[in-house]
Amino acid sequence: MSSFRDFLGPKLNRRNMLQVASASAAAAVMPRILNIPSAYAQAGSTLVIAAPATPQSLDCNFDVSLGTFEAIAALYDGLLGFEKIPDAQAPDARREDIAFHGDKPGGVNMVGKLAESWELDPSGKRAVFKLRQGVMSNWGNELTAEDVRWTWNRAFELGALGAFYTAVTGLKKPDDVKVEDKYVVSFNVEEPNPLLLKIHTNLYTPVYDSVKCKAEGGTDDPWARKFIENNSAGFGPYQLQQLVRGQQAVFQARADYYGGKPAIDTVVFKEVPTSASRVQLLQGGAVDIAQYLQPLEIISLKNVPSVAVETVPASFMIWIELNAKIAPFDNVDVRRAMNFAFPQQEVIKAVYQDLASPLNGCMPNIYPGFSGEFYSYEHNLDKAKELLDKAGMGSGFKSTLAYNAGDPVQEPIAIIYQSALKKIGVELELKKVPAGSFYNFVTDRKQPMIFYVDSPWCPDPGYSLTLYFDSKSYVNYSNYANAEVDKLLAEMAATADENVRLAKAKEAQKIIMDEAPWTFVTYPNYTMARKADLKGWTYYTSNNIRFQDFSR
C-alpha cells in the first residue's frame, strides 16, 4: 500500500486558503490602520501590508489560513528551496523554478536553505542533508540535526497536517528521521518516494528550535503547542515583535540571519477586512502592499502612477464540489451535465475581468504533469439537458450551492451559474455562509454543492492528485471514489521514475475529468499590488509573499 494512502483524514484539518475575516465598514478600519507606532515609522525601513486577516496561529501544524502564510515564511526556514528565475509575464518579478530537470537529483532545481548540501540515494529511499553550521534561531540556539528530528517527530505525534506530510513523504515512524551526526540528518522510507526532496521546499515543513520549544513546553506540553501558537521559534529571517489578533502583527529583521539581514527592517502586517479599504490605503500611500483585491479594483489600480500591479499565472484553483454521496450527484451524467451548464467564459469576463483562465484540469496548470486535453465541458445547455435526460432527471431537480460570504467572487459566480441552470430545469438555492464558519461547512461534507478554493503547495502531480482525489484523503471533499484512480496514485507514489509517474498521472487525470467530481470554474491569477518603488517581489507556489525579498 502506498504511503500516500496512509493519511486517514480525521487528523488532518486543512483550512481553506482563501478564507477571510468577516467584513467591517471602511470608516472603522481607517483610523486603526493609519495609527502605526512611531517606532515602526522609519522612512524606507518599514513595510506596511494591508491584509484581510492577521495570523490566527503561528503553529503551521494546525493552521492554514490567511495571515499565517506570511508569518510562517518570515519566522521559519526549511531545508531546501526552489531556485528563482525571471517571470516571463512580470518583468520586475521572479518565480520559483518548478519545472522538471532530468539532470538534477529528484528532477528538481533546488537551492540549499538550512541544508548546505544533500544527497538522494539512487534507490529513492533515502535522502541525507548536511546542515549549515553556525545558523542561529531567534533565541540564540544553534541549528542541529536534533532540531530536524524533533520537528518531524512532532508531526508524527500531533497528527493534523503533520499526518499528511509524513505520510505523503513515505515516513512510517519517527525513527525514519535519523540523526547521523550533529549537523547531518537522514530521511529513510521503505518504498521509493518522489517527494523526499520536494517536501522540504514546502512552506509548512519548517524546522523548529527544539531547545527553546522543549524548555517552554516542559513536561506538561512536550511539543510546545501553546508556545508555538503565539511565538516564533525558528531560524527564519524575521522574529516576531508583536501579535495582536484582529489588528496587526509586527516583525523585526534579524541581523544574525544566516542569509544576511533583510533590506526591510520592520514589517507591519495590518488587518483590513474589506478590499475597498485596502485599495484606498494603497492609493493614499498609507500602506506598501494591498493583498487579495477584487478584479475591478485591480483594474482601477493599474491607472494609479504611484502603484505597480502585476498579475501572473498561479497555482490557485477555484471549483465547486459535487458531493458524490448526495443524490443526484452520485450519478456521473448529472455531474457532467452540471459542467456543460457552467458558463465558464462568461464568469471569466464578467467576474474576473479576464484576470483568470478556464479551469480545464484537476491540478494546477503551471505544475509538471498537468494535462488539459481531457476537458470537454465547453458551455452547452443542449448537451447538459441531454445528459440529464440520460440520467432520468429530464424534468430537472432542486439543489443547494453554499458559498463563502468573505470571498468577493463566489456570490457573483453563483448567481451566473444559478441563471444558467434554471434554463435546463435545475433550481439552485444559494446559501451564503459567513466566512468564519464556511470551512466547517466544507469539511462536514454535508452540502450537495459547495465552493472551494485551494492550491496544492508541492508542485508535483502525485501530491496534487492524491490530495483531492484519493478516496481516503481528508481533503477529498467531493467524496469522489474510483478504485482505478486510487491504484494509479498508489503506483505513482511507489516509484521515483518520473516518466512512469507522469504517464500514470495522465491516466488518472483522464478518468477524473471524465467523471467530473467538480464543477470546474477557474484558475485565478495571483496579483501583486504595491507601491511602485517597492522591488524584489517573487511569486511562490504557496501564493504568499516573503518579506525578505523586498527592498527600495
Segment roles from a protein language model:
Residues 130, 165-217:
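Surface-exposed binding/hinge segments that line
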Residues 48, 144-153, 182-188, 192, ...:
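Alpha-helical secondary-structure segments
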